[in-house]
């Protein structure tokens, strides 16, 4: 069972602005699973996230860590948003 109290996969070398961008993206992913999220909001936050997390390897590592602790996949959320293109997505179980 996934705990509702989990930590976010953050890099200690990030500055406050970078942490804010990453957290905004992870929060949008949470909203996609827990309720629904506007596709544009999720994709915009992903673009900002990618300015901080430039490498695919680090992005995959963050996805794995976040999925392990929260049960939510950043990859699946972005994939669904890109396929939907507009409106809202909901990945709730």
Swiss-Prot record:
A Pfam family that the UniProt record links to this protein: UPF0223
InterPro entries according to UniProt: BH2638-like_sf, UPF0223
Protein family per UniProt: Belongs to the UPF0223 family.
Protein name: UPF0223 protein gbs1030
The organism's taxonomic lineage, starting at the top: Bacteria, Bacillati, Bacillota, Bacilli, Lactobacillales
